Structures are given as structure tokens and as C-alpha cells.
Amino acid sequence: IILSFVAITVFQNFLPGLLYGQGFAVSNLLYSAYMGDAGIFGLPLGIAANIVIVFLIFGALMERAGASRWFMEMALALTGWSRGGPAKAAVVASAMFGSISGSPSGNSATTGVFTIPMMKKIGYTPAFAAAVEAVASTGGIILPPVMGAIAFIMAEWINTTYTAIVIAATVPAILYFLIVFVSVHLQARKDGIEALPRSELPKFWPVFIRGWYYLMPIGVLIYFLVIKTFPPGIAGIYTCAAVFATSFLAPREFWLTPARLVQAFDEGVRRWITVAAITAAVGIMIGALELSGVGIKVSRFIVDLAGGDLTMTLILVGLVSLIVGMGLDATPAYITLATLMAPALIQLDVPPMAAHLFVIYWGLASFYTPPTCIAVF
């Protein structure tokens, strides 16, 4: 995608129709990409360096501190008694941990180890169990209050507050998981899957008391973001410190000792390197789009193709967002779509926040949509 936009910028004067322009020398493109405000060192990489890395480390710390296992036990205690309970527990656990981890595919690999065998054990088919895990893990990215790192990136991008984004995203997230719950329940009725005996389920209060401290870092995050209105990066640092401190309330095997801290930081930074490389490359794309004007032309083309009709524009933007999101992780997918697709909706007087939420919802759908559906792998 990025190389195609670079080629378009350089050879624009040889291209027909929508892509035609004056064309720019490679030296101009390199200058724009390296020195321009919208280039490699522009907003995408700046957000990755200041915000995303902190929350990727936060997710890795929570994972090393045993949070994923506790979320799974809590989810079982809350929903395991109902028909198809383990599948509903998988939805709850994957949603809770997916919101923290920020990576649908990574979350599927982490929680899926527990949830998929559990769903298969009570009678769900392997394909359905994997599908439930993939959909729930992806939905964690749109679930407040954390929403991976997307809420913080969006706040910077459209110049609004984190609180406003959380409020706007709450109802769609509830509807998303309500539909997943209903699907799981109906499939359980269809397959004749009964509820697990309560004797086989963990008790709510013993489980809650055993791991209530895993909720404290999330409370710290909300406090510093909403009440103290700290920048997301600073709030994330305090949250990481809270994870470290509360880990010593967990069983000794989950204490964040120096060795486990190194492992968590290593894992978080490894995830960030991928994001940083992609966001830097996206910066090159944004620089090329700014130089060539193709981004504006694409937005206008979509609106013109839809005849200025908002419904048709939403359909076109949704389809393109689904295709563009394939193969990208959540954060790079959002940045790419915010650059290419959101302006088309804003041009039709759709509020910026609604436009950005719309494109990321459709972009994330690519995680469980063939042919790529990387959360399924």
C-alpha cells in the first residue's frame, strides 16, 4: 500500500484520471517524508513513541502478573452457570484482556489457550470455538475504558478528550458483545449444550478476593486520565507502576521480579518495534498523500461515486476500510484508515469522532473476515 502511494507521487504526471498530477522528484518525496510535519517523524510515529509503547508494556506486565488467568476465572464464575457458559466466559475474558493487550491476534493466542479447549470440551465445534475467541478478542479493542491504545491515538488525532471517546464508544461496544452473547447462546441451544454444574465452577467471591488487585491498575489509569487529566503516556507510566506494585499481592509465581520485568519489557518492546516500523512507514504514506493530494482526491472520489448520499458513502467507506485493514494490526490499521477514509465522511458533515469510530470498526472486522482473518490464526 505504502509503496503504491510512493510510486503514485513520483509518477503522477503519467497516470490517468483520479491519480493524475504534476508528479514529484524522489528528492522532494524524501524531503517531505524526512523533514515534513506529516512524514516519518510525524503524528503516527510520535504517538507510537509516546503512547503506544507504554500501553503495550502495560499489557505485557498484566499478562506476566497473571491477569489473563484471573480474568478467565472471573468470567467463568460470572457466566459459567448459564447455557453455553464457558463460551460466554470466553467472550468476557477475551474482551477484558483484549482491551488491555491492544492486539486481537496476540490476545487470541493468550486467552485462546484456555478458552478454546474449554468450549470444545462442552460440545462446541472447533471452528465455532475459534470463531468466538477471534471475534471476542477483536472486540476488546473497542471496549472502554482502555480500548488498546486506539482511544488515546484518536484523542490526539481529532483533538478531543479521552473521556469523550470512551463515552461515545460505550454503547457500540455493549451492542457488539450483546450480539456475540446472543449468538453463543443460540448456538448452544441448537447443539443441545447445557450449563455446567455449579459444583464444577469457581465461586465468584473467592475468585474476586484472590485477584481483586488486578482491577487496581485500571482504576489508576482512569483516575489519572479522567480526574487528573494527565497525558495518556504519563498516565500509562503510573499504571505500569501500579501493576508492578500490585503484583506482589499475587501468588509468588506472578511477582514481577527483575527477571519477569525484563521479560515483560522485552515482550512489550518487541510488539512496539513492529508498530513503530509500520507507523513510520505510514508516515511516509501520509507525506506522499500530502505532497500529491491523492488523499483528498480519494475522499472526493468516494463521495462523488456515492452521489453525495451518506448511506452509499458509508457502505463504500466500510468496504474499503475492511479491505485496507486486512493484514494490519489494530493501531496501524486505524492510522491508515484515519488518513484515507475518515475525511470522506467528514466531508459529508459526519462528526469527526463518529467518522473515526466508523472506520476503525470496519477495519477491525478484517481480523475475523476471510481471506486474512489474522485473529483466527
Language-model segments: what does each one mean?
Residues 151-152, 156-175, 232-234, 358-364:
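Transmembrane helix-loop boundary segments of multi-pass membrane transporters
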Residues 1, 167-271, 374-377:
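Long, contiguous bundles of hydrophobic transmembrane helices that form the permeation core
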